[in-house]
């Protein structure tokens, strides 16, 4: 297996819900430009005990995994362990992990455990990492578990007694906009619309719609459309819609902690409340003024379109800042998403990495050393700097580092940190958007984006759409 083997499919993933109360999570791992001297602290204390072992890591196509695949030598030098990394679209990863675990095999020892599509439905196939954390024969987790953001959301299911993954990445949906175009047209836009159009949490979703429509009608010489969306019939559509659903004060279920530790029994869906119906009606209206190719774009398609100058603004995952800075250097601004009748809600898409419980003997120990190293502060900083990656740290201590804080302003050698102000605001409890972490989410997710696709195609009205979703949710969950 080639170390950088990839499967065709979408880059970057879906994801979104993490824990707030326990510390929200940021994400990413670290490796770019990493040298043996930048290894995890405590090197030489238990790192070589599985030397000669080979392990396989299966991951979604993500920035941190790309960075580590490009530079895993520091880990191999530190441990003597060879790691093969396979990257692919999330939906393909889910199927491969299911087959591996259900078959009692461990072709993949380390697993990218998306909280909704892997961790919740397959938690029984993952090793409880507490056994390694509490065993002194292994190097300690640097700075301890308390340093992780969103440990519950990314690493646990149903209970805090078991830990299935360590937070690895944390893409979060924010408002990306062409700062240069807003600067150019601000006065004219403000005069026409009657409000200051500067992107911020003070702008409502209704005003966002008006801004998009204004660009469509008044700025064609500079940009084809005002807004773009990841509205393909795919998980990305559910992600995009969820921001609006939560902003309007609605949700999928009414269960405490369902977005953090999750639940096996979410009960009846709450998708037919007046707030949910209003959210669907607004989203349907918004897509009518969006770039028409929005219905063909997932997050990666949208990211490429924004970087190519096709839209003036969009809601997208903050890790696309690195791409923006390459294509539109100095021309992009970032804010939390607009506010609905209830709040601003910003989808959190963090994920942890865990260990296949089918792995045997030295494979388990070697896999843990990789999980520990890949989520360490030093590795996350290296990933931030990587030309191949550019991850999103999941450690509080990383955000407190002077060099990382400096990178929040241009010129920056860590372009994803240019979003820090918006992202840290998005992670506040009142602003974060957390999907329900339930074992049936793969089925529910499909129900959401299938019905939404019918709605935005004009074959199903918003009220019928939400009623259909709710009915199908309840049928799946019994």
For each of these PLM feature ranges, what is it?
Residues 62-82, 180, 448:
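Short, polar/charged alpha-helical segment
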Residues 207-216, 244, 248-296:
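Glycine-centered hinge/linker elements that transmit conformational signals in sensory
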Residues 42-47, 115-174, 240, 333-335, ...:
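Hinge/lid segment of periplasmic solute-binding proteins
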Residues 1-11, 22-29, 373:
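N-terminal secretory signal peptides
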Residues 56, 73, 102, 161, ...:
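Extracytoplasmic/periplasmic substrate-recognition and gating elements
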Residues 73-149, 165, 184-186, 190, ...:
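Extracytoplasmic "Venus flytrap"/periplasmic binding protein-like
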Residues 34, 294, 412-472:
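C-terminal capping/gating helix-and-loop segments adjacent to ligand/active sites or protein-protein/ligand interfaces
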Residues 51-62, 82-86, 110:
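Short, well-ordered beta-strand elements
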């Amino acid at each position: 297996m080639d170390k950088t083997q990839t499967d065709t499919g979408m880059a970057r993933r879906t994801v979104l819900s993490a824990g707030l109360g326990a510390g929200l999570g940021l994400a990413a791992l670290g490796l770019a430009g990493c040298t043996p001297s930048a290894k995890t602290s405590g090197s030489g204390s238990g790192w070589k005990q599985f030397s000669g072992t080979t392990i396989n890591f299966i991951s979604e196509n993500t920035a941190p995994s790309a960075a580590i695949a490009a530079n895993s030598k520091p880990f191999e030098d530190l441990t003597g362990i060879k790691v093969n990394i396979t990257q692919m679209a999330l939906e393909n990863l889910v199927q491969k992990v299911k087959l591996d675990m259900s078959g009692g095999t461990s072709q993949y020892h380390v697993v990218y455990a998306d909280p909704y599509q892997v961790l919740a439905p397959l938690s029984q196939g993952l090793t409880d990492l507490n056994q390694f954390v509490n065993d002194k024969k292994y190097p300690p987790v640097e700075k301890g578990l308390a340093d992780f953001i969103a440990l519950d959301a990314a690493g646990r299911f149903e209970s805090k007694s078991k830990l299935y993954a360590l937070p690895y990445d944390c893409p979060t949906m924010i408002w990306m906009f062409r700062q240069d175009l807003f600067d150019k047209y601000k006065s004219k836009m403000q005069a026409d619309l009657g409000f200051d159009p500067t992107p911020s949490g003070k702008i409502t979703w209704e005003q966002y719609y008006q801004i998009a429509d204004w660009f469509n009608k008044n700025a064609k010489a500079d940009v084809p459309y005002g807004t773009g969306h990841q509205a393909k019939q795919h998980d990305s559509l559910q992600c995009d819609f969820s921001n609006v659903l939560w902003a309007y004060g609605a949700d999928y279920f009414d269960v405490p902690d369902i977005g953090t530790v999750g639940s096996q029994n979410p009960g009846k869906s709450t998708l037919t409340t007046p707030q949910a119906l209003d959210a669907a009606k607004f989203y349907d209206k918004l897509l009518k003024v969006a770039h028409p190719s929005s219905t063909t774009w997932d997050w990666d398609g949208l990211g490429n379109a924004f970087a190519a100058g096709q839209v003036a603004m969009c809601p997208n995952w903050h890790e696309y800042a690195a791409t923006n800075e390459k294509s539109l250097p100095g021309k992009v601004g970032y804010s939390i998403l607009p506010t609905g009748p209830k709040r601003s809600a910003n989808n959190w898409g963090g994920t942890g990495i865990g260990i296949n419980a089918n792995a045997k003997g030295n494979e388990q120990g070697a896999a843990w050393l990789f999980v520990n190293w890949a989520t360490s502060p030093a590795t996350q900083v290296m990933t931030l700097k990587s030309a191949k990656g550019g991850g999103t740290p999941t450690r509080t201590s990383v955000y407190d580092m002077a060099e990382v804080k400096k990178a929040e302003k241009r010129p920056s050698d860590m372009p994803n940190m240019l979003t820090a102000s918006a992202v840290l605001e998005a992670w506040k409890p009142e602003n974060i958007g957390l999907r329900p972490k339930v074992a049936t989410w793969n089925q529910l997710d499909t129900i959401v984006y299938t019905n939404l696709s019918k709605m935005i195609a004009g074959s199903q009205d918003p009220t019928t759409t939400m009623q259909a979703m709710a009915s199908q949710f309840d049928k799946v969950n019994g």
